[in-house]
Regions:
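An acidic-aromatic substrate-binding cleft motif
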Residues: 1-29, 33
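Aromatic- and carboxylate-enriched substrate-binding clefts and catalytic-loop regions
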Residues: 37-210
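Short, conserved micro-motifs enriched in small and acidic residues
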Residues: 16, 210-212
């Protein structure tokens, strides 16, 4: 289980206090991990995006020390194009190992052609060298590579809980069916829910989500 700061409400931003609150939440729930999600290194998929440099408002050593004091380890989100830029992932993964990062979540691949499949394998192998776990978001369905590289913890490849922010397509019937379809292929990152208890008639997708 992992706390995930992407399910933001209202005007919550990528800030030190917010990250620490999610670390506290992970500790309270007995979860071992907290994911520092998109924009931790500033705007992503931009020419100047650098996956080795935290955004100016974030003090990464302080965050990681705080997490260690709570017996929580951190994951980092990455945009796939930023990972590929000049093979920057090789330097970045070595840096994350020094920081004590538990794993990385790479997002928005959205393809399953041969070139992309080969890329997945290169990334998994490089991550393994640095004792990091990996979660592929925006990913195709599992293909068995996790049997060779168990540091591939999970992947999305599913219409999961985050869709409830902007869609009514995630129904009880859909969720029950997943156990007999998608989950047969391998580990699944369903993504978080909003922890709101309403009937189907009373549910309204809203992004950003709000808590009454």
């Amino acid at each position: 289980m992992c706390a995930w700061d992407h399910w933001w409400s209202g005007e919550v931003k990528m800030e030190m206090d917010v990250i620490k609150e999610y670390i506290d939440f992970a500790e309270e729930q007995g979860w071992p991990y907290m994911l520092i999600d998109w924009q931790w290194y500033g705007p992503y998929n931009k020419a100047h995006a650098d996956i080795t440099k935290p955004a100016p408002q974030l003090n990464m050593p302080e965050i990681l020390e705080y997490a260690r004091s709570k017996n929580v380890r951190c994951w980092l989100w990455l945009y796939c194009t930023d990972v590929n830029k000049n093979d920057s992932y090789k330097e970045a993964f070595a840096l994350y190992e020094k920081w004590g990062i538990a794993g990385i979540k790479i997002d928005f691949m959205d393809r399953d052609d041969q070139e992309m499949v080969n890329w997945y394998h290169r990334i998994i192998k490089e991550v393994a060298k640095h004792k990091l776990m990996v979660n592929f978001h925006g990913a195709y369905k599992p293909d068995g590579i996790g049997r060779t590289y168990p540091n591939l913890l999970t992947r999305e490849g599913v219409m999961g809980g985050e869709y409830s922010k902007f869609s009514k397509r995630v129904t009880p019937e859909h969720n029950v069916t997943l156990a007999f379809t998608r989950m047969l292929a391998g580990p699944m990152d369903y993504t978080p829910g909003g922890f709101l208890n309403v009937s189907m008639e009373g549910f309204k997708p809203k992004n950003p989500t709000t808590v009454p």
